[in-house]
């Protein structure tokens, strides 16, 4: 038994070392994205919640994990790469259908803390794409759909490094949505994900965006299906060859379950 434990620890350490080596020479921001993308590409949420899924052995050796194991994995990788990283834990809320506490991370970049929830982003990514709805959020944004904290963590007050803002995927005008989506259709890309920052994402605004996207798609003989993360005002415009029964569907980042058809 002791020999088996020792072998397991050696294999785990070897895995961590290999991952850390691949990030050598990266800037802190690149390291954070590298860790996030590793989770989103290699870890599946364990709906059975096996014991090892709560520890780093789940994500790093079994390729599965729950939020606790994922947050611990993000932390150990960030620690080894020289990035300051903490784990945040929120309360459960049984009355709202949230049966368990939830864990995610805070990462420090240039003396400023940001929220990073790789579990939630992982629950949104489909057909090989990666989502960044929970990458470098400030307190105002993260607590739109995260429960109050079990214990205090540093304040996150900077919203300017939110992934979609920093990568010019945060749009404020309907004409910008039209222009970007037409470019996606021209390039025959399968989808376009963006953050809406042009005021409240009301039903009226959403219907206007749907109209713009549908018209642009029809011109190319295509259809569009829109998935909306209302909490973070992020939407995905997916190009399809067939008309969906439900053009607009709600998607909610959570513990590995995607809602909507």
Label for each model-derived stretch:
Residues 12, 31, 66, 70, ...:
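Hydrophobic (often cysteine-bearing) scaffold residues that line and stabilize catalytic clefts
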Residues 129-260:
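Low-complexity, Gly/Ser/Thr/Pro-rich intrinsically disordered linker/tail segments
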Residues 69-141:
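Hydrophobic/aromatic-rich core segments of domains that either
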Residues 5-8, 117, 249:
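Short, charged, solvent-exposed linker or helix-capping segments at domain edges/interfaces
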Residues 56-70:
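A short, highly charged nucleic-acid-interacting micro-segment common to nuclease
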